Design a protein with these regions (language model features):
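Helix-turn-helix
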Residues: 3-45
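Short alpha-helical scaffolding segments that buttress acidic/His motifs in well-ordered protein cores
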Residues: 86, 100-107, 153-157
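Amphipathic alpha-helical packing segments from all-alpha helical-bundle domains
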Residues: 77, 111-137, 186-190
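Amphipathic alpha-helical segments used for helix-helix packing
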Residues: 93-116, 164-169
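Hydrophobic alpha-helical connector segments
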Residues: 55-95, 146-153
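Short, basic, alpha-helical segments at the C-terminal edge of helix-turn-helix-like DNA-binding modules
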Residues: 45-49, 58
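All-alpha amphipathic helical-bundle segments outside canonical DNA-binding/catalytic cores
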Residues: 117-120, 137-154
Length: 199
């Protein structure tokens, strides 16, 4: 993942990847088929880590949205729970720059795993948040405004993920603290209320 994160798919060679991992070129071919297979395996690892952390709350949220019985207050609570889960995950992984850089590269370069991550992670996540924002606003139908709000809301988390080095430098520390997590959670609640017009 490190080579892809640093050089992108086109810039990373299987020779460099093998040297970095301390394996032979045939080992990559045996386990992954080729460079693209290895690249997709990295994307699956990222998706798996996200699912391990977020699957319970996301699964419950999707079921609540589908039920049609979710109240505005309930939708707001779920939004906050999702944001707090993401804040916790990103702050814990702030030092793992290869994962966030890999994702950033996929977004900017549209590498081979872009469509996979879009289909399995980004699109469903943004649309779920948009649906919850609509319900929390008292609407049954999700609008383009809800989708745009979800995009802007979730993109604010880049300060904790692929931009964490900048954030930590500004905060004058080497890692996020428990106090940072509390403050970020409180701010997330304020952002939700602002998007819902409750601020």
């Amino acid at each position: 993942m490190k080579c892809f994160a640093q050089r992108g798919f086109s810039g990373a060679t299987t020779r460099a990847i093998a040297a970095e991992a301390g394996v032979t070129l045939p080992a990559i071919a045996y386990h992954f088929g080729n460079k693209e297979g290895l690249h997709h395996a990295c994307a699956r690892v990222i998706l798996g880590r996200y699912q391990d952390r977020m699957s319970p709350v996301v699964t419950a949220a999707r079921a609540a949205v589908r039920s049609g019985a979710l109240t505005a207050a309930g939708a707001r609570d779920i939004l906050l729970e999702i944001m707090q889960g993401l804040i916790e995950a990103f702050m814990q992984e702030a030092g793992e720059t290869h994962q966030s850089r890999f994702v950033s590269r996929e977004l900017s370069d549209r590498g081979p795993a872009y469509e996979y991550l879009m289909k399995e992670l980004w699109r469903p996540g943004v649309l779920l948040v948009a649906d919850l924002l609509a319900i929390a606003s008292g609407r049954n139908a999700t609008t383009d405004r809800d989708k745009t709000a979800a995009l802007m809301f979730l993109s604010s988390l880049t300060a904790l993920s692929n931009q964490s080095a900048i954030s930590l430098s500004i905060l004058d520390r080497s890692r996020f603290t428990d106090s940072d997590r509390v403050i970020a959670g409180q701010l997330a609640g304020g952002m939700i209320d602002g998007l819902l017009g409750h601020g």
